[in-house]
């Protein structure tokens, strides 16, 4: 299927959602990524959390573009297990270009300017400073970006398409794994012997910053452990999208 270059400005909907075959082993993910990197080249960025879905995407992307650019939003509040995983990924996929993108403010500067525990008193502001604003800077020179969202992760992600108009970042967001289940993600990881975050084996299905991540027990919502004391399940990177 020949699809013209899709930009934020000319976006008219996802051309793949009703036409691409999801019967292959990757449920359309490989074909979507092939199209994305062929279309956008170095103008597409993968914003990677290094969660379970990330490992699947990294493996697929590496087959298509081994020197792809991957950006990790390093808030300075991540678990040591996450940093350990990044080191293992660098060894496993040596050609990847991994950028550790930090916020403008250090934790000390943020504490002096706002609050010593801003994530507790105003988590939305903390997420903006340490995640959203840094990604805005990264995507300033990118036409599109890749995300590992799955439809079954949470109600806020249930309507995600392969190709999305991203109102938050005025960009195109490519989500190849929308039809994957959690079991399929883990089957792929185990089948291909991919590295993954050790915290996943300790009841952490979704892993973010230390203060805002808790283990999950007996819950169908994989994001139940994120901001568990607040009416909040998203950091803000994905909430402004319009399919």
From Swiss-Prot:
Any Pfam family hit: PAPS_reduct
Main location group: cytoplasm
Keyword Metal-binding: no
GO cellular component: cytoplasm
Cofactor(s) this protein requires: [4Fe-4S] cluster
Keywords: Cytoplasm, Oxidoreductase
Cofactor comment text: Binds 1 [4Fe-4S] cluster per subunit.
GO BP terms in the entry: cysteine biosynthetic process; hydrogen sulfide biosynthetic process; sulfate assimilation, phosphoadenylyl sulfate reduction by phosphoadenylyl-sulfate reductase (thioredoxin)
Recorded coiled-coil stretches: none
Keyword Oxidoreductase appears in the UniProt entry: yes
Class of enzymatic activity (EC top level): oxidoreductase
Pathway in which this enzyme or protein is active: Sulfur metabolism; hydrogen sulfide biosynthesis; sulfite from sulfate
Similarity comment: family membership: Belongs to the PAPS reductase family. CysH subfamily.
Function recorded in the entry: Catalyzes the formation of sulfite from adenosine 5'-phosphosulfate (APS) using thioredoxin as an electron donor.
Descriptive protein name: Adenosine 5'-phosphosulfate reductase
């Amino acid at each position: 299927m020949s699809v013209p270059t899709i930009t934020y400005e000319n976006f008219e909907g996802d051309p793949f959602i009703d036409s691409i075959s999801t019967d292959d082993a990757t449920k359309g993910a490989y074909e979507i990524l092939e199209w994305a990197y062929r279309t956008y080249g170095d103008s597409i960025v993968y914003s990677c959390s290094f969660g379970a879905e990330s490992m699947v995407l990294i493996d697929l992307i590496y087959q298509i573009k081994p020197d792809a650019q991957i950006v990790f939003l390093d808030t300075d509040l991540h678990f040591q297990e996450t940093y350990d995983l990044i080191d293992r990924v660098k060894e496993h996929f040596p050609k990847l270009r991994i950028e550790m993108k930090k916020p403008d403010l250090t934790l000390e500067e943020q504490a002096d300017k706002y609050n010593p525990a801003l994530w507790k008193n105003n988590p939305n502001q903390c997420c903006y400073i340490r995640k959203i604003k840094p990604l805005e800077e990264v995507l300033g020179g990118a036409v599109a970006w890749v995300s590992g969202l799955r439809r079954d992760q949470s109600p806020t992600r249930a309507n995600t398409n392969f190709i999305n108009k991203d109102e938050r970042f005025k960009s195109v967001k490519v989500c190849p794994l929308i039809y994957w289940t959690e079991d399929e993600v883990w089957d792929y990881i185990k089948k291909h012997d991919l590295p993954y975050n050790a915290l996943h084996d300790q009841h952490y299905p979704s892993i973010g910053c230390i203060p805002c991540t808790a283990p999950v027990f007996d819950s169908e919502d994989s994001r139940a452990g994120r901001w568990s004391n607040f009416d909040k399940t998203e950091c803000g990177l994905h909430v402004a999208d319009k399919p």
